[in-house]
């Protein structure tokens, strides 16, 4: 972060917590921490807050860079450089890294090393509407990291590792830059030597199978079951199948369903919508057609005798929609949306034939005198949606231009005064 160099504040507290002088050597700090940590460990009836304070003091004073900041600026300097609480790790993790996994006398701590949770791995899974209607299974081959079986995830032949000398086993480094008089920049970043692990393994001791990486790649085939009625965006989870890592609870592999567009059917919840066009003759005189459903069943769709279908009319069929998720014997509705195709023009004879069977035209006819008093107009075809979009864009542009003319000058003058 960037900021003013913090004022000097109390820089003796951490030394007092460990019971050492300000000139204490790293060996003095280790001895003091060992004694204080064992005495105050919660598993031995100690005070958790005191134990946390001891771990915090040791982590700061055992790191040469953090200790330098603390000696110069106290806790305030650490907070400004590392955000809030000084970037301190879990006190139990510090204890475990110091004493190893055995805890007290090999019996192990009841709390143990706190494991972090690994990241979930998310994959999109494309499915058709037919897949969601009928249900399906898909086999997918994936590569993932698993703990090396030869070294059991230790990375070494002996199963041992050393704390990184560069970062004192914390995995993090703090760098300080002087930007100018009274201005400093402090940044925390992963240690370059150990790549943030806090551990180092000698070349001779590296595991020959994983080369010290602790994990190896494994190919695995997962069978994903897509159940009837599942939705676009729904997740299918395989717990604990993501990448493995030491001291880490393995995350999940998550498949997110992505439904492909269907040319005829649209889905809304548990209902299906189907578009169908009728000729004017069919709309007026009746129709029938075969609808091929998502499971390839053939449905006969026909109008009732004497029924007239209007443009944009909907008809519904019960229990022919989507299966309901985890209730596959219950289904939504199938709605058919009708559009009517009108002829582009009619001959005079066709008009007379239609007039003979259709309701007569409006009885009120205009006289020649009334027509002479009117102004003639010419109609043209329009795409109403495109027209509305164009008008909205034009109105928005005019409003923007008006606002710029009304306030732009005053704002520029104000900025000039500042």
Curated annotation (Swiss-Prot):
Keyword Metal-binding among UniProt keywords: yes
Main localization of the protein described in the UniProt heading: membrane
Membrane topology listed for this record: Lipid-anchor
Residue ranges, annotated region (Disordered): 382-418
Record's keyword terms, sorted: Chaperone, Lipoprotein, Membrane, Metal-binding, Methylation, Prenylation, Repeat, Zinc, Zinc-finger
Example of a GO MF term: ATP binding
Propeptide: 416-418
Entry's localization field: Membrane
Lipid positions (S-farnesyl cysteine): 415
Residues modified as Cysteine methyl ester: 415
Record's GO cellular component terms: endoplasmic reticulum; membrane
Segments annotated as CXXCXGXG motif repeats: 148-155, 164-171, 191-198, 207-214
Name this polypeptide is given: DnaJ protein homolog 2
Native organism: Allium porrum
Gene name tied to this protein: LDJ2
């Amino acid at each position: 972060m960037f900021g003013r160099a913090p004022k000097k504040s109390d820089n003796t507290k951490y030394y007092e917590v460990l019971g050492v002088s300000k000139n204490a050597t790293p060996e003095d700090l280790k001895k003091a921490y060992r004694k204080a940590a064992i005495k105050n460990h919660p598993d031995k009836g100690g005070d958790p807050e005191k134990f946390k304070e001891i771990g915090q003091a040791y982590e700061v004073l055992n790191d040469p860079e953090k200790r330098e900041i603390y000696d110069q600026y106290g806790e305030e300097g650490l907070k400004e450089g590392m955000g809030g609480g000084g970037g301190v790790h879990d006190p139990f993790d510090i204890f475990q890294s110091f004493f190893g996994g055995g805890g007290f006398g090999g019996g192990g701590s009841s709390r143990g090393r706190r494991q972090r949770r690994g990241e979930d791995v998310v994959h999109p899974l494309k499915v058709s509407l037919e897949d969601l209607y009928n249900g399906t299974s898909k086999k997918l081959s994936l590569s993932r990291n698993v703990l090396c079986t030869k070294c059991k995830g230790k990375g070494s032949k002996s199963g041992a590792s050393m704390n990184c000398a560069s970062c004192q086993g914390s995995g993090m480094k703090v760098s300080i830059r002087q930007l100018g008089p009274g201005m400093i920049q402090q940044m925390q970043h992963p240690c370059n030597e150990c790549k943030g692990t806090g551990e180092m393994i000698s070349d001779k001791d590296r595991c020959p199978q994983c080369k010290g990486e602790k994990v190896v790649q494994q190919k695995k085939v997962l069978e994903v079951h897509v159940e009837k009625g599942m939705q676009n965006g729904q997740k299918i989870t395989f717990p604990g199948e993501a990448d493995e890592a030491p001291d880490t609870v393995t995350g999940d592999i998550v498949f997110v369903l992505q439904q492909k567009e269907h040319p005829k059917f649209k889905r809304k919840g548990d209902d299906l919508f189907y578009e169908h066009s009728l000729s004017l003759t069919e709309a007026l005189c009746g129709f029938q057609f075969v609808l091929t459903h998502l499971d390839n069943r053939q449905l006969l769709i026909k109008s009732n005798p004497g029924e007239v279908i209007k443009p944009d009319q909907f008809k519904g069929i019960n229990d022919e929609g989507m299966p309901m998720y985890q209730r596959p014997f219950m289904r939504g509705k199938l709605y058919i949306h009708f559009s009517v195709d009108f002829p582009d023009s009619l001959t005079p004879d066709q008009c007379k034939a239609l007039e003979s069977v259709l309701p007569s035209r409006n009885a009120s006819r205009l006289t020649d005198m009334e027509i002479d008093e009117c102004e003639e107009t010419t109609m043209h075809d329009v795409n109403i949606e495109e027209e509305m979009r164009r008008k909205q864009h034009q109105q928005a542009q005019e409003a923007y231009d008006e606002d710029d003319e009304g306030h732009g000058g005053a704002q520029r003058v104000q900025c000039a005064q500042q």
